[in-house]
């Protein structure tokens, strides 16, 4: 999909405030409401806008421990990876799972839990019990320096 400056402005504004009214969005980017809404609908239909979400405060939910977890697999087969990916996607504590290269690991997970006891339980009772997991290395987040979900569009 070819994006013009209005589309890029729409995307930038919606990434910052997905609940903005169409009228306010149109005012901000300099279009009238009808063409603005048509553009938003076209961006949604194309899949470029894949959804709208609320961003929750983890601390207020009691989720205070975040870890980056490197997972090594025993065999590098499509079946082994597919099984791991299916099983890891079932764990609500896993915020992100990336297949990586350049490390002594196959996957990097970003997980969030209540405390170290909850992390130990997640690791020992669920993650390491997935077939094929042969090694785990954890690093704990001390502070989020950049925490941005917006993609560069301009």
What spans do the regions from the language model cover?
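A compositional/biophysical signature of low hydrophobicity enriched in polar/charged and small residues
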Residues: 1-154
């Amino acid at each position: 999909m070819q994006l013009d400056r209005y589309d890029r402005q729409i995307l930038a504004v919606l990434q910052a405030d997905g609940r903005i009214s169409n009228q306010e969005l149109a005012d901000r980017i300099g279009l009238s409401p009808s063409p603005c809404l048509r553009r938003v609908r076209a961006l949604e239909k194309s899949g470029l806008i894949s959804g709208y979400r609320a961003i929750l405060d983890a601390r207020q939910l009691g989720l205070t421990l975040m870890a980056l977890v490197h997972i090594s697999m025993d065999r590098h087969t499509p079946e082994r990876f597919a099984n791991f990916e299916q099983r890891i996607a079932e764990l609500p504590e896993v915020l992100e799972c990336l297949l990586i290269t350049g490390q002594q690991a196959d996957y990097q997970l970003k997980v969030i839990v209540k405390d170290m006891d909850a992390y130990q339980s997640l690791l020992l009772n669920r993650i390491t019990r997935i077939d094929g997991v042969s090694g785990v290395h954890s690093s704990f987040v001390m502070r989020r320096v950049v925490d941005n979900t917006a993609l560069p569009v301009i």
